[in-house]
Amino acid sequence: MKKISRKEYVSMYGPTTGDKVRLGDTDLIAEVEHDYTIYGEELKFGGGKTLREGMSQSNNPSKEELDLIITNALIVDYTGIYKADIGIKDGKIAGIGKGGNKDMQDGVKNNLSVGPATEALAGEGLIVTAGGIDTHIHFISPQQIPTAFASGVTTMIGGGTGPADGTNATTITPGRRNLKWMLRAAEEYSMNLGFLAKGNTSNDASLADQIEAGAIGFKIHEDWGTTPSAINHALDVADKYDVQVAIHTDTLNEAGCVEDTMAAIAGRTMHTFHTEGAGGGHAPDIIKVAGEHNILPASTNPTIPFTVNTEAEHMDMLMVCHHLDKSIKEDVQFADSRIRPQTIAAEDTLHDMGIFSITSSDSQAMGRVGEVITRTWQTADKNKKEFGRLKEEKGDNDNFRIKRYLSKYTINPAIAHGISEYVGSVEVGKVADLVLWSPAFFGVKPNMIIKGGFIALSQMGDANASIPTPQPVYYREMFAHHGKAKYDANITFVSQAAYDKGIKEELGLERQVLPVKNCRNITKKDMQFNDTTAHIEVNPETYHVFVDGKEVTSKPANKVSLAQLFSIF
């Protein structure tokens, strides 16, 4: 058999087993763990290539015949970092491995059969990840949705009704009528969406009514009063309906301290938002809950990574987001109690230790909706530069750290909110919400986004040019955004109770409507690559953070990767 050099092979088919790829301008190095394509039998589309009838394309159409095949992709997922063909059929991932013509080629499985009905997308030299999931959305403006989508986020979970003061401060869509409006508004967008109801009440009937109206869970927020009673009742109803509860705890410790909140939670599962505390929560020690077995702890992106500008930036943001007044002494003291450089410094380290499990945005309410993915990778890179390789790494690569940080915005938020059966990873049977990246722009600017198996967004040149590539090249909506295609390509998540009662038909929804499930039978141990539990304490006078008796902190960065170099114009 004729052989070619590794350099020639990579240029034709992309990296193979043992090859290493740098992610953007970071120090993070991904190494290909396995190549499922077969040497000499690789798929390649184009003039004089192999994707043609009688070669890699079968002339015997079958029911397994793919709608789309992505060839020779480098998949970066919590399940592994590996090379494979990805087959898509009926909007889902039908197969991962060796695609082609099983009548002519070895190793081709039925679920990766290429036929006359199959479209081809060249994945050689590209990285494929699952679409990101942002679970901390203030639905203040609908313009957030395309902004997040262009960053690689394909699922948004949160609450709100637009720029009302309640929404500016809290991720809550309160009540049946508001949920109806938001569920109907969701029809317009290329984004999977789910809405959180108001959990700040001790009235079980009111809580239940919101879940039956289509909410996928509750948000309890201090601006509405995060009392032990509200926590207990929301969790009681959540347990009954199998939905998640997210919480922003009591910064002022009005109704109790962190110990009182944990007593009210009573060992039940809860998703804690901005668990470090700068975004809100028991001052100064909400961060200690991150080590508990029943807590699914999240960060929001304004505090990660910790930089020389973080502290100064937060004061003005906080005053606006929580309707505070700089002329009122108590409001200023409230803000000061939340912005603690010591706990922010510890946050980066806790992410690197796998104690913090999820990253999210806190969109337009101190966080940036288009930067969840970028800031997650900036944090990973900052921590590698400061602390070196993780002890869990095997070989001369950063694969473990890469899986740890990828999981924070893909599979872990999916598990937390009961949607991991559908989205959150590159696995057979899941919805084909996929993001394609050039390695040089990984984490900053996707090359293309596939939504429900159909191309929804892509970098595209002048529409009047003779080929697709002439400038100006920028993101443009593709056909999955338009007409009734957007209904097939996107999902509205609801509770099982609302699904069973026919919420789709009741509200006249045309999008896919799917129920969340398995929200209450999970713990920290279900958080992939981020399941570390520990005893965390905060010194009440200095705010220094200790994990199992050892102080943890990090230095503020004066320069980060994936930044201005990629945004010159």
Swiss-Prot record:
Presence of keyword Hydrolase: yes
EC number(s) reported in the record: 3.5.1.5
Active site: 322 (proton donor)
CDD domains, sorted: Urease_alpha
Pfam assignment, any one: Amidohydro_1
GO cellular component, one term: cytoplasm
GO molecular function, a single term: urease activity
Keywords, comma-separated and alphabetical: Cytoplasm, Hydrolase, Metal-binding, Nickel
Domain Urease: 131-569
One annotated GO biological process: urea catabolic process
Name assigned to this protein: Urease subunit beta
Source lineage: Bacteria, Pseudomonadati, Campylobacterota, Epsilonproteobacteria, Campylobacterales
The gene coding this protein: ureB
